[in-house]
Amino acid sequence: MKENKPVDPYAKYNEQSNIIAKIIFASRWLQVPIYLGLIVTLAIYSYKFIKGLWALVINVNDMDSNTIMLGVLNLIDVVMIANLLVMVTIGGYEIFVSKLRTRNHPDQPEWMSHVNATVLKVKLSMSIIGISSIHMLQTFVNASNMPEKTMMWQLLLHLGFLVSAIALAYTDKILYSTSHKTH
């Protein structure tokens, strides 16, 4: 005697839904060219750093201390932006595309062992504040050549970054404490 299996009325829907889910999941790979573009941008910043360092070295005898300080601050700014690019590239790829699988690599940065969206947001906001701080320092070292209105807007923008970072940290603290409460 042949057993009649019940017909699943949702079988076709489930199959289509599964195909859509696979397409959506695979779409994360569309970000790869973006991360590769960030690596190209990092190469551009490396070139800019070397060019700025070379200009500082060959012109050091013709520079006063303020000009040297501005040159050094510019180099620090380039380094901080490069660090930001590395964090976004590695962190974004790890979080949104695929694992890098570098767990046993001796040069793996410490922060990569616990990278997640929250850690990345905090690191990014701290980097942006650091970059903004360097720009503020450059502005105040060169204050005699800067319009007052430009300095005011830079200060307000920097304060906006600070307030945003504090709000982000506070929000993450609330979310973390709420999600980890024991009942």
Curated annotation (Swiss-Prot):
InterPro entries named among the record's database cross-references: UPF0114, UPF0114_bac
Keyword Plastid attached: no
Keywords: Cell membrane, Membrane, Transmembrane, Transmembrane helix
GO cellular component entries: plasma membrane
Subcellular location(s) per record: Cell membrane
Transmembrane domains' residue ranges: 38-58, 68-88, 124-144, 150-170
Membrane-topology annotation of the record: Multi-pass membrane protein
Family: Belongs to the UPF0114 family.
Protein name: UPF0114 protein CGSHiGG_05795
